[in-house]
């Protein structure tokens, strides 16, 4: 590959790459505001100006003092060029740190801060604001303007998710380009010129497409804030874990930001993955974290309706085993979950095999509104993983299960997860059975129909993996610890197997995952 030199280091580049792109790929940051690897080049912030010492120089006219003549004479010098727009060339020598570049960066910073409000103590971007970071790195001086700063609109609600502060805006146009190029909706633009510039909505429109939170995500300052995260947490108190979105079968990669002091998740952010979601997520995916602590099942229960009472886990497991043992294996339905990890589903499939139960079903949410950007028509994150767990066996649907209950072909049910497309009224046939055991993290129609419910850990509380619509297996990390006494579903299934007198052949997650390798090989 051809190479150029940046600040004394050789950088390989591909044909058509800019200096910025090649440096970014190598993990080298050239200061910038408007450039983003997933968006078109705007080159309007001028923070990424670099000095081309040899190669594709641009000449800038100047007056230079000629000592021999004792006067200023016309001359030229290399012009600083934006790295985001400068095409890399073989043997080019570039500096992003010499004195001339540093002076230019300090000037850009001073210019941007002339009218910028000192909102840092109340700004949600504080702690991850490039304007703050670059001030300390590239300016560090007081502004020289002593007059009243220009005032612009503040707290403007662009739509149901985003609030705009024009005084903080540096006009990088990232938000405009996200709407145009990612969401394919030209709903934002800018008006006026100079220090009167501001971002505006298209006439008669709101910022209400499916990717509005990406405008806040790409904003390098605090001009765009999310109504969900606004004023809720300081980012320096948050830790981050690697997750996978549970919103649909695309499986967008996420950063899960949480506060370890109170065990609360505050937001999701897209995690770059060129094969899956690139740099983006949809709004619904960004908000899936809100389900974590909503309608949680925290205690095992037995009985139905008004007779449902909480019990200890040991008592619940023993009663569940008693009810399942009372059903002939040929009439026992095992319901896997398209919401749970592949590991959880594999553990349940192993239990089904140990019991000799071949009636396998899948509980899944119904379809939602997909698109040709990121959103899959399949509302479930792991339909493919559940199928992989049973080595490609065709899983029947919940309506099939209900029909078999009504015909008498099914007389007992062991179900994983809470999510189905059906309501409790539609699941009424299950209430006629004496033995319906539900392993679930949340309440829902399926757990409500059960005779025994046993709480299990939520996705944010376990290590696991999903298989997305493209067949790509993606792992995720436990973000939080589950509530006291609650275990991952695969562990609870193993404990239930023990009560049923069955050995599933694994003792820990690593041993279970070896079964995934075996299942994948069997499916080929």
Q: In which residue ranges do the predicted regions lie?
A:
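A basic, amphipathic helix-loop patch mediating RNA/tRNA/ribosome contacts
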Residues: 19-53
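Short, structural beta-strand-to-alpha-helix junction motif
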Residues: 4, 18-21, 341, 488
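Phosphate/diphosphate-binding loops
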Residues: 62-64, 68, 209-270, 417-420, ...
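Conserved short loop/turn motifs at secondary-structure junctions
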Residues: 10, 33-38, 165-168, 200-206, ...
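Cofactor-/ligand-binding subdomain signature composed of acidic, glycine-rich
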Residues: 146, 154, 259-330, 374-380, ...
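Short beta-alpha connecting loops at secondary-structure transitions
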Residues: 3-5, 90-96, 199-204, 240, ...
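Non-catalytic alpha/beta scaffold blocks inside enzyme catalytic domains
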Residues: 327, 344-345, 351, 355-523
């Amino acid at each position: 590959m051809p190479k150029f030199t940046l600040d004394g280091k050789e950088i390989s580049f591909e044909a058509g790459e800019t200096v910025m792109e090649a440096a970014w790929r190598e993990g080298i940051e050239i200061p910038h505001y408007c450039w983003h690897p997933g968006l078109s080049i705007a080159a309007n912030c001028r923070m990424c100006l670099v000095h081309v010492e040899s190669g594709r120089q641009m000449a800038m006219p100047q007056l230079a003092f000629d000592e021999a003549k004792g006067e200023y004479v016309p001359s030229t010098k290399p012009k600083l060029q934006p790295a985001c727009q400068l095409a890399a060339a073989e043997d080019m020598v570039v500096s992003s740190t010499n004195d001339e570049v540093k002076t230019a960066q300090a000037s850009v910073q001073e210019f941007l801060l002339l009218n910028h409000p000192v909102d840092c103590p109340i700004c949600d971007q504080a702690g991850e604001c490039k304007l703050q970071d670059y001030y300390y790195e590239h300016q560090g001086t007081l502004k020289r303007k002593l007059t009243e700063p220009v005032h612009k609109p503040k707290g403007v609600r662009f739509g149901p998710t985003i609030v705009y502060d024009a005084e903080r805006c540096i006009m990088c146009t990232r938000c405009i380009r996200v709407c145009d190029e990612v969401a394919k909706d030209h709903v934002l633009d800018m008006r006026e010129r100079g220090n009167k510039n501001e971002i505006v909505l298209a006439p008669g429109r709101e910022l209400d497409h499916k990717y509005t939170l990406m405008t806040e995500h790409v904003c390098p300052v605090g001009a765009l804030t999310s109504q969900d995260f606004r004023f809720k947490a300081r980012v320096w108190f948050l830790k981050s874990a690697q997750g996978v979105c549970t919103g649909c079968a695309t499986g967008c990669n996420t950063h899960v930001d949480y506060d370890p002091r109170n065990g609360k998740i505050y937001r999701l952010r897209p995690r770059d993955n060129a094969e899956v979601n690139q740099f983006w997520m949809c709004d619904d995916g960004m908000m899936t974290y809100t389900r974590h602590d909503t309608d949680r099942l925290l205690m095992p229960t037995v009985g139905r309706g008004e007779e449902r009472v909480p019990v200890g886990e040991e008592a619940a497991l023993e009663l569940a085993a008693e009810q399942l043992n009372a059903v002939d294996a040929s009439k026992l339905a095992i319901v896997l979950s398209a919401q749970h990890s592949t590991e959880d589903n594999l553990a349940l499939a192993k239990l089904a095999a140990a019991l000799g139960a071949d009636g396998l079903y899948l509980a899944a949410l119904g379809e939602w509104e997909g698109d040709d950007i990121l959103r899959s028509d399949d509302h479930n994150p792991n339909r493919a993983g559940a199928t992989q767990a049973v080595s490609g066996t065709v899983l029947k649907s919940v309506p099939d299960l209900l029909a078999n209950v009504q015909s008498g072909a099914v007389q007992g049910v062991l179900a994983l997860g809470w999510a189905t497309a059906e309501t409790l009224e539609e699941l009424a046939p299950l209430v006629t059975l004496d033995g319906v055991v539900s392993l679930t993290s949340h309440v829902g129609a399926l757990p409500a129909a059960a005779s025994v419910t046993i709480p299990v850990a939520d996705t944010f509380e376990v290590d696991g993996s999903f298989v997305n619509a493209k067949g790509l297996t993606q792992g995720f990390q436990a973000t939080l610890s589950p509530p006291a006494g609650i275990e991952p579903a695969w562990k609870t299934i193993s404990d239930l197997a023990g009560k049923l007198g069955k050995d599933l052949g694994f003792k820990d997650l690593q041993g279970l995952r070896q079964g995934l390798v075996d299942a994948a090989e069997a499916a080929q």
